[in-house]
Amino acid sequence: MARVKRGVQANRRHKKILKRAKGYYGARSRVYRVAVQAVTKAGQYAYRDRRNKKRTFRRLWIARINAGARLNGLSYSRFINGLKKANIEIDRRVLADIAMHDAAAFTALTEKAKAALA
């Protein structure tokens, strides 16, 4: 049987890893062995942070809604409770956007929430 040389596959694999490590500092972008570790770790961070991003954005939306609600004399929890009682189903992302960009509409929502709480 003929001897199998794996140079082509090795070069391809190395090139693929070094391409993904492009822009990394120092040896991380040049030395294959170090680049493999850097790329693997980057993948772990990316996986973790794709999940954390959802939490982070939810926290941001809640902070924005709370700020808007307090300007209209309600706390966040009472505002959300009022919306639920008034059967207004708007998600937090949209509520935060309304609070930031359309103060009049948000004030109208807070008035409806207050009415439902009374």
Swiss-Prot record:
Q: Which Pfam families match?
A: Ribosomal_L20
Gene Ontology biological process terms from the UniProt entry: ribosomal large subunit assembly; translation
One Gene Ontology cellular component term attached to this UniProt record is:
ribosome
What are the entry keywords? Ribonucleoprotein, Ribosomal protein, RNA-binding, rRNA-binding
What GO molecular-function term can you cite, just one?
rRNA binding
User: What family name appears in the similarity comment?
Assistant: Belongs to the bacterial ribosomal protein bL20 family.
Instruction: Report what the protein is called.
Output: Large ribosomal subunit protein bL20
